[in-house]
Design a protein with these regions (language model features):
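Active-site metal-binding motif and surrounding structural segment of the metallo-beta-lactamase
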Residues: 50-101
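Short, hydrophobic/aromatic-rich segments at coil-to-beta transitions
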Residues: 18-25, 73, 122-128
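Residue-level detector of beta-strand structural context in well-folded domains
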Residues: 12, 34-36, 116-118, 141
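Generic beta-sheet signal
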Residues: 77, 97-100, 116, 153-154, ...
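Metallo-beta-lactamase
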Residues: 2-15, 21-22, 27-30, 43-46, 94-139, 146-148, 172-173, 177-180, ...
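Short glycine-/acidic-enriched loop or helix-start segments at secondary-structure transitions
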Residues: 56-57, 84-86, 108, 162-163, ...
Length: 234
């Protein structure tokens, strides 16, 4: 199983809820890169998108559920998640939105860019800093809509297998296991959390987040051991 898929993508829907849905373009890849379409009154916002055949029809379907046929914009929430944001934005004639404080991203996007802080356009989603550090290099923004209880965490949390130790169903990223973003994420008690690797948690997400943060350090070496074993065994 490759870390990242290549070639023709095979879009698989995840995370359908009243207000959006997600997709994984390469379901068989280890990283399980997840993207999301958030339907708002301002149109559909695409979060950290990976392109795939059938994506535009998928976006239209998500928009139809909310009574909109417009793509409002594309947003990059992690400095490493430029993915296919520029190509998709150009195709739909919209800007790529990049947090104002995030460095080294806007100049690498071959598309019009809008820098933003606070609310993402008129989406109802408020942006906030999850992590902005040089060691490890990490610039991550979260999104939260208090009206729908939807939280987007693009990297610090995930459900892909390499995020999970023991019986965890939502885990902290391996690189952050010893320094989890507990102070930031524990402020939220969302109904659902959408993540950038794997399917999200669509109910009682606040409890799942608290459990993940609480077990982060305790389960760190179990996760590292599992990862090392998988690497050795292939």
């Amino acid at each position: 199983m490759p870390m990242k898929g290549r070639g023709p993508a095979d879009l698989r829907e995840i995370d359908r809820f009243d207000g959006g849905a997600g997709w994984i373009a390469y379901p068989d890849e280890t990283m399980e890169r997840a993207s999301h379409a958030l339907a708002t009154d301002a149109g559909v916002w695409l979060v950290d998108p990976v392109d795939a055949d059938g994506l535009d029809a998928f976006i239209a379907d998500v928009g139809a559920d909310a009574g909109t046929d417009e793509v409002a914009g594309v947003v990059v929430c992690l400095d490493r998640h430029k993915r296919d944001a520029a190509a998709i934005a150009r195709r739909h004639g919209v800007d790529v939105y990049v947090p104002r404080w995030m460095n080294g991203v806007a100049g690498e996007l071959d598309a019009p860019v809008t820098r933003f802080s606070g609310e993402l356009g008129d989406s109802g989603f408020e942006s906030f800093v999850i992590r902005d550090s040089s060691l490890p290099p990490w610039q991550e923004a979260g999104l939260y809509d208090p009206d729908t209880g939807t939280l987007v965490v693009p990297e610090s949390l995930g459900t892909a297998a390499y995020f999970l130790a023991d019986d965890e169903t939502l885990g902290v990223h391996p690189m952050l296991r010893l320094t989890p973003p507990a102070e930031v994420l524990s402020r939220y008690d969302p109904e659902r959390v959408l993540v950038g690797h794997g399917a999200g948690v669509l109910s009682a997400a606040g409890e799942a987040i608290n459990d993940a943060l609480a077990s982060s350090k305790r389960n760190a070496f179990a996760l590292y051991g599992k990862t090392a074993k998988q690497f050795i065994m292939g």
